[in-house]
Amino acid sequence: MGSFSIWHWLIVLVVVLLLFGRGKIPELMGDVAKGIKNFKKGMTDEEAASADKTIDGKTVEHKSDEVR
């Protein structure tokens, strides 16, 4: 009972096909692909926005003859 045989997987496949139908599975996979694509697009947009951000800073002048 510890491992699944080919018959277990065939029964699971038949149950999934009966529950969702033949037309619903490709639609679900398309929705998953669109979600992944939008997630990747959002990540690249966020990285581009953070790279464009400028930070105001002060210039610190040091004397060249000072020794620390």
Curated annotation (Swiss-Prot):
For molecular function, the Gene Ontology terms on record are: protein transmembrane transporter activity
InterPro entries per the UniProt record, alphabetical: TatA/B/E, TatA/E
Taking the first listed entry, what is the main subcellular location of this protein, grouped into a coarse class? membrane
Q: Does the record's keyword annotation contain NAD?
A: no
What membrane topology does the annotation report for this chain? Single-pass membrane protein
Q: Where is this region: Disordered?
A: 46-68
Example of a GO biological process term = protein transport by the Tat complex
Name the residues that span the membrane.
Answer: 1-21
The protein's superkingdom reads: Bacteria
GO cellular component terms? TAT protein transport complex
Task: Give compartment(s).
Answer: Cell inner membrane
Q: Where is the composition biased (Basic and acidic residues)?
A: 53-68
Q: Which UniProt keywords apply?
A: Cell inner membrane, Cell membrane, Membrane, Protein transport, Translocation, Transmembrane, Transmembrane helix, Transport
Q: Which family does it belong to?
A: Belongs to the TatA/E family.
Q: Which NCBIfam families match?
A: PRK00720.1, tatAE
Spell out the subunit comment.
The Tat system comprises two distinct complexes: a TatABC complex, containing multiple copies of TatA, TatB and TatC subunits, and a separate TatA complex, containing only TatA subunits. Substrates initially bind to the TatABC complex, which probably triggers association of the separate TatA complex to form the active translocon.
Query: What does this gene product do?
Result: Part of the twin-arginine translocation (Tat) system that transports large folded proteins containing a characteristic twin-arginine motif in their signal peptide across membranes. TatA could form the protein-conducting channel of the Tat system.
- Descriptive protein name: Sec-independent protein translocase protein TatA
State the species of origin.
Answer: Sinorhizobium fredii (strain NBRC 101917 / NGR234)
